[in-house]
Amino acid sequence: MERRARRPRGRFYAFRRGRWNHLKRLRRRYKFRHRRRQRYRRRAFRKAFHNPRPGTYSVRLPNPQSTMTIRFQGVIFLTEGLILPKNSTAGGYADHMYGARVAKISVNLKEFLLASMNLTYVSKLGGPIAGELIADGSKSEAAENWPNCCVPLDNNVPSATPSAWWRWALMMMQPTDSCRFFNHPKQMTLQDMGRMFGGWHLFRHIETRFQLLATKNEGSFSPVASLLSQGEYLTRRDDVKYSSDHQNRWRKGGQPMTGGIAYATGKMRPDEQQYPAMPPDPPIITSTTAQGTQVRCMNSTQAWWSWDTYMSFATLTALGAQWSFPPGQRSVSRRSFNHHKARGAGDPKGQRWHTLVPLGTETITDSYMGAPASELDTNFFTLYVAQGTNKSQQYKFGTATYALKEPVMKSDSWAVVRVQSVWQLGNRQRPYPWDVNWANSTMYWGTQP
């Protein structure tokens, strides 16, 4: 039975599992006065359409022997996409490629670590470089070891999608590791992250705060809508690179409130989350007689598209997303920011412990660090962002679009996000070397006693 103690001003304390827990108790006269108003609050109305936190249940897991708190603080720039020079694109279709101002920020420890890593050519775009590197082209010896000297293998493959938010972020991490840059000059893999933490495990995600501000004015009406969702609740799929085997990779289309109700292996009908970027194959006409006006038909292999899909501005607004107006459409103040706060584990399964390094493996390799062996890339929350406009394509559902630009020595950001995140690592190993086992087992080579 837990001990309870009363404190002044209506505070309530309970001693449970080795610590004092503070619970807020509203005064009696306050509760009954505002009981009728709480039923029709704005937040309760929005939760009827989309509940950002479906809830968790507590699991009786032991507290760690020792803990270490990790804090992240930084800024994320949501920029417009770029395209390679037009003379290097196949067929000259670069003049007809458009992108949408959408983004998706996943809250997981892996991407937060990538956001605080070295700012190099393949891991980040822009920003200061932590150290003096050689960047004189691919003819030097450093091109084989330093990532900022490498050139893309194929100039037709996109380097990143808006889901890789950590590429355009500058994040500080506390506590810092002064030897991380020299040990890992390139982008860290799951194997390197597991070795950096050693025997620590991810005990819980404490809190993450987002403050989003629209920075680009697009016409007379261009607010930025942002919605925070728990886990992978509304994620259609993650970003993948283009490959010739795209037809054999299955796609999940059964997310709530989007129109997708089944599983498909290829051509799905576009809804408010997927724009018709992959046109269907034209019908095969066997007759040689001219039928009407001759037009140029393109099949699915002659068009460029992306599997990475996002929520449109209209969908986010219908789910109760917040709006942030850019400067010029509204005076800049604290209310100009969209504030989002994510607390707790955010895992509907209720588990608190997460594996950083798989147990029972002596040598850590990439195969062991892949899901579900390692949970560094477990998404606790997801922030969906889209900018609206009064003039947009019909299948974009009010989302602002733009023509892809060639790479220039500056980036054009349409939103800025301030981030603060707190994580806690735990150690389950007993730190007492004088403990003994109740029974010892011995084994001889070749025989079993």
UniProtKB/Swiss-Prot annotation:
InterPro entries xrefs:
Capsid_protein (IPR007291)
Coiled coil location = none
What broad class describes the main subcellular location of this protein?
A: host cell
Regarding protein family, the annotation reads: Belongs to the gyrovirus capsid protein family.
Task performed by this protein: Self-assembles to form the virion icosahedral capsid with a T=1 symmetry. This very small capsid (25 nm in diameter) allows the virus to be very stable in the environment and resistant to some disinfectants, including detergents. Essential for the initial attachment to host receptors. After attachment, the virus is endocytosed and traffics to the nucleus. The capsid protein binds and transports the viral genome and Rep across the nuclear envelope.
Describe its assembly.
Homomultimer (Potential). Interacts with Rep; this interaction relocates Rep into the nucleus.
Q: Per its record, how is this protein called by name?
A: Capsid protein
List the source organism: Chicken anemia virus (isolate Japan 82-2)
Give the lineage: Viruses, Viruses incertae sedis, Anelloviridae, Gyrovirus, Gyrovirus chickenanemia
